[in-house]
């Protein structure tokens, strides 16, 4: 006998429109609050978007990121990212790392004195360490990177909306677009509110959120389209409720199992990936909410073309019967 885990019963009868004005008000408030927080606080941009200096290290000993970080802590450098670099072409005693130091406000790059202090601190940890290269990225290049990230998110939103429009109708595309903008905006608002570091990995997380959220939304929309053809005389609101209830078990199971893995990474993954994992974790929660409450509400308010209500075939037949 097979054992099946069920977080939600297969057949539910929840009225998801019962609190539609409350959920609409909540979503509107959170979106507007996110805009205000983004305007007042701004995002805490990481090295990728602020510019800074990258010091490449090479040693015959294994890279100890924790020891490197501890050695640099007394220097009060601010935002420092230390990553080990792997490459199949490296030799057995070639251990490479990158130390990325964010530029201070108003500065083009880290000063040579600071670079010398960093190199001296790392040499105390590993006397065999060398520094093959030191590269700096100014604010202009970082500003271009910010715009590229904005274009990437905007292009993703446009492409997803176009796909939904082709597969369903324009009302569904608008519902999906509003839902996705809602998810991204609120996630960025949380990052601005708590001043969580916002870097390229966060952009990757936002794009992941878009894909995950639209996946849930498409599942609901696909079931809605099937039920619209199946229950042609049922009111649209009831068909939507039925469709969400029929897909609820799948939605909760998928999101729940994903969140279990993400929470484990959030707690045990360390500082390097914490921002990325937090963005995806929060985005999946808000994306599941928007798939159930935001996207379908927009479709309901815009209305959906219902062939059964217009009955064009019967009208044409009546015209032929009445013709002389």
Predicted regions and their residues:
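A structural signal for conserved, well-ordered secondary-structure elements
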Residues: 1-324
